[in-house]
């Protein structure tokens, strides 16, 4: 019986070879498995929840902000991430806010002291004068992208993929309050309070390989030169290394995301400097010498308006952006 089964398998492989078909590579299978945990209706439901009246626009220190933090904690726990210091969230004051932090070891058999931080701010304008500012693009899209990247990495770890760096996923609060959330995260690092739950050692600045910030990744209105809707902007390629741009291009081709790629803020050096170094959460880390990258689709006329709603986001494009960020991160780790 065993010989018969072997013969059938051998003939099948022989026929596949004669017909020019190839057995998929391990990398191709792995990439497909990671893709399969992210789909458009799932993204829609998550962005819809975060921009719903239940979250109230997610203003720092409000019930809606707390609801959002609890949602992040639930998602991190479901994915199998590990809390830091036994707690999923860390608090700061003036204003009162909380960062939500989850940890993913890079490998099981060996544990490295190299770390990549992937973060997105979850706070928004809230409800002002009775008017809800949903903040679907700004920045429910970035939060959902960050959580989706975490889910893809957890999927890969569960099937045996190992990485050279551990990943720390952070939902930041209070960007709109002078980036208090990212400043609180940096203070944790400075004070030695951000500890590796596997080794128990402090995650010090010299161990942080890179920070990746995802801020407003759902827009399609402010387009690049070609006018295509399906694009993505990566700011900070110099910080990520000389080959980061070509690596992003390679991943874009290899994994079929097919996005138009931009490496500055719509061709303006001044605006690139402002958005990369001044107005988003990677600023705090850049000021402290940590290599940092920002992924964005830029500001649109919907941002910070009552009509920044889930229905303005093209989920098929958001999905491809998430896939590309994940595959690029896999390569640079």
Please place each PLM-identified region on the residue numbering:
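Acidic/His- and Gly-rich active-site-bordering loop/insert found
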Residues: 50, 76, 93-129
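Extracytoplasmic/secreted proteins, especially bacterial periplasmic and envelope-associated proteins
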Residues: 38, 42-45, 49, 63-78, ...
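N-terminal capping segment at the start of a domain
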Residues: 23-67, 79, 301-308
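Metal-dependent peptidase/peptidase-like ectodomains
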Residues: 172-280, 292
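Alpha-helical metal-binding/catalytic segments enriched in His/Glu/Asp
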Residues: 102, 118-179, 325
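His/Asp/Glu-rich mid-to-C-terminal helical/loop segments that flank catalytic regions of hydrolases
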Residues: 30, 296-333
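Bacterial N-terminal signal peptides
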Residues: 7-16
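A non-catalytic alpha/beta surface segment that caps or lines the substrate-entry region
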Residues: 57-105, 262
């Amino acid at each position: 019986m065993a010989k018969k089964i072997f013969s059938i398998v051998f003939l099948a492989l022989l026929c596949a070879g004669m017909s020019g078909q190839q057995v998929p590579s391990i990398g191709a299978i792995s990439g497909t498995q990671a893709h399969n945990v992210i789909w458009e209706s799932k993204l829609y439901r998550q962005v819809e929840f975060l921009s719903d009246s239940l979250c109230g626009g997610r203003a720092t220190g409000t019930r809606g902000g707390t609801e959002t933090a609890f949602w992040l904690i639930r998602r991190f726990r479901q994915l199998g991430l590990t809390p830091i210091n036994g707690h999923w969230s860390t608090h700061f004051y003036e204003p009162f806010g909380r960062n939500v932090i989850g940890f993913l070891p890079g490998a099981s058999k060996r544990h490295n002291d190299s770390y990549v931080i992937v973060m997105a701010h979850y706070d928004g304008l809230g409800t002002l004068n009775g008017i809800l500012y949903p903040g679907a693009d700004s920045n429910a899209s970035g939060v959902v992208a960050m959580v989706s990247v975490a889910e893809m990495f957890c999927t890969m770890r569960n099937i045996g993929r190992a990485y050279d760096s551990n990943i720390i996923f952070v939902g930041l609060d209070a960007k709109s309050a002078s980036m208090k959330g990212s400043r609180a995260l940096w203070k944790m690092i400075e004070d030695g309070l951000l500890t590796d739950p596997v080794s128990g050692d402090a995650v010090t600045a010299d161990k942080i390989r890179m920070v990746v910030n995802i801020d407003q990744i759902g827009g399609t209105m402010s387009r690049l030169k070609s006018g295509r809707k399906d694009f993505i902007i990566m700011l900070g390629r110099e910080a990520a290394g000389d080959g980061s741009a070509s690596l992003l291009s390679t991943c874009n081709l290899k994994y079929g995301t097919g996005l138009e790629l931009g490496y500055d803020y719509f061709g303006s050096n001044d605006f690139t400097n402002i958005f990369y170094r001044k107005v988003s959460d990677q600023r705090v880390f850049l000021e402290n010498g940590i290599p940092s990258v920002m992924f964005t689709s830029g500001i649109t006329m919907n941002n910070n308006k009552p009509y920044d709603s889930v229905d303005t986001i093209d989920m098929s494009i958001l999905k491809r952006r998430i896939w590309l960020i994940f595959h690029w991160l896999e390569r640079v780790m």
